[in-house]
Swiss-Prot record:
EC numbers on record: 2.1.2.11
Tree of life domain: Bacteria
Cofactor or coenzyme needed: Mg(2+)
Main location: cytoplasm
Upper taxonomic lineage: Bacteria, Pseudomonadati, Elusimicrobiota, Endomicrobiia, Endomicrobiales
One example GO MF annotation: 3-methyl-2-oxobutanoate hydroxymethyltransferase activity
Cofactor comment text: Binds 1 Mg(2+) ion per subunit.
InterPro entries: Pantoate_hydroxy_MeTrfase, Pyrv/PenolPyrv_kinase-like_dom, Pyrv_kinase-like_dom_sf
Cited function: Catalyzes the reversible reaction in which hydroxymethyl group from 5,10-methylenetetrahydrofolate is transferred onto alpha-ketoisovalerate to form ketopantoate.
Protein name: 3-methyl-2-oxobutanoate hydroxymethyltransferase
Keyword set, alphabetical order: Cytoplasm, Magnesium, Metal-binding, Pantothenate biosynthesis, Transferase
Record's subunit section: Homodecamer; pentamer of dimers.
Subcellular location, record wording: Cytoplasm
Pathways per UniProt: Cofactor biosynthesis; (R)-pantothenate biosynthesis; (R)-pantoate from 3-methyl-2-oxobutanoate: step 1/2
């Protein structure tokens, strides 16, 4: 596939062509997804939920992100590869932020990083961008702030929240972010932010007017069933297919129906 870059994504904003993004955490899935010419693979810290079985994303480490990014990198064919910076990898000091972003790029092979937050982290965003690491912002429902917000809640419904989100988005753009993810933001607010910014917005549960869309791959394939957000559309029921296949395998082994002659060596 033709290689996508940051410039590719920026040009799609200008042309009005929608940007496509999915999360990805491993080599095999990266091969499958990128074979369909997707624009962006995001190694999300959502791997804490869907791959590591954590209750939330807060326990995910930089080493976790590097490990999974390396796996995705080996399977990726052409997509821009972005990796989340996990909780407390950029909040404490600017130096930590740059150091950890550099590790994710140098050791993991990511081509950009993503951070959650607005005006309160713009010094980190600028420092990472100045260090020649492309960076994406993330506003609205920010899973790393679950304890601050008291759970996973739609953000931007009050006038105060609306004004803050717009200011945050503009601050991220001004300090070097090349795109912003908007999660669980009311559709009309996401539309307004998209129209105000020169950089692309990528929506997840934020309506139809963002410049692109992203979903957690395990959600849209029907593999992760612990919880399904309202905004998810399931394009397959892979989880049910796996359960059926495993049941059939167990039954055939117990009945002596597998392996058959064609599955043996002579």
């Amino acid at each position: 596939m033709k290689k996508k870059t940051v410039l590719t994504i920026l040009k799609k904003k200008q042309s009005g062509e929608k940007i496509t993004m999915l999360t990805c955490y491993d080599y095999v899935t990266a091969k499958l997804i990128s074979s369909q010419d997707i624009d962006v693979l995001l190694v999300g810290d959502s791997l804490g939920n869907v791959k590591l079985g954590y209750e939330n994303t807060l326990s995910v480490t930089v080493d976790d992100m590097i490990y999974h990014t390396k796996s995705v990198k080996r399977g990726n064919d052409g997509a821009l590869l972005i990796t989340d910076m996990p909780f407390m990898s950029y909040e404490i000091t600017v130096e930590d932020a740059v150091k950890n972003a550099a590790r994710i790029v140098k050791e993991g092979g990511a081509e950009a990083v993503k951070v959650e937050g607005g005006i309160e982290i713009v010094d980190r965003v600028k420092a990472i961008s100045d260090a020649k690491v492309p960076i994406v912002g993330h506003l609205g429902l920010t899973p790393q702030s679950i304890n601050k917000f008291g759970g996973f809640k739609v953000q931007g419904r009050t006038e105060e929240e609306r004004g803050r989100l717009i200011a945050d988005a503009e601050a991220l753009e001004k300090t070097g972010a090349f795109a912003v993810v908007l999660e669980a933001v009311p559709e009309q607010l996401a539309k307004e932010v998209t129209e105000r910014l020169k950089i692309p917005t990528i929506g997840i549960g934020s309506g139809r007017y963002c410049d692109g869309q992203v979903l957690v791959v395990d959600d849209m394939l029907g593999m992760f069933t612990d919880f399904t957000p309202k905004f998810v559309k399931k394009y397959a029921e892979i989880g049910e297919m796996v359960r059926t296949a495993v049941k059939n395998y167990i039954d055939e082994v117990k009945k002596g129906q597998f392996p058959r002659e064609e599955n043996t060596y002579k």
